Amino acid sequence: DRRQRQMCIRDRYKPLSNKYLDEMFKHIRARFGGYNVAKHSTAREVIKLRREGRRIAVGLITDQSPNRSEAHYWTTFLNQDTVFMDGAERIAKLMDFPVFYCELERTSRGYCKVLFDLVTETPKQTADGEITECFARRLEQTIRREPAYWFWSHKRWKNKRKESVQHG
């Protein structure tokens, strides 16, 4: 079946409070054949596609500072106490998907290549936080090597840890 051989492209996004702008941005994001999935529906969408026998690759951009409600994993990152979203790790463990670290390498003006590095083929066998910690270490290496390419305005350290939260 042709549909099962095609790769499903889903764009995880945070819905905007302004419904008009939300629809406009969804339309812009979907113009190349992607399909928008609200961030709170990501795991359900992945499960649905897997049940349908569809080929799935889940790419999550997780270098931004999470909202307090999303703050799940704390570690030292660039010498700062930093919180990371752990949704990618949770989905990988739920579905037992292999995990790759992905980075872009600029080759010339306007061109880059995408590099994938295997983190684990067996996420269910990893300790809680291990995948997210590996991501944090790899991201830190990437930033130290190419600091100009990181988007520094993410307000990465706006969240402060409560004393009761465990450190990664």
What are these regions (language model features)?
Residues 12-41:
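Membrane-interfacial amphipathic helices and adjacent loop/beta segments
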Residues 5, 26, 67-69:
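A generic signature of intrinsically disordered, low-complexity regions enriched in glycine/proline
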Residues 1-9:
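Single conserved hydrophobic/aromatic residue that forms the stacking wall/gate
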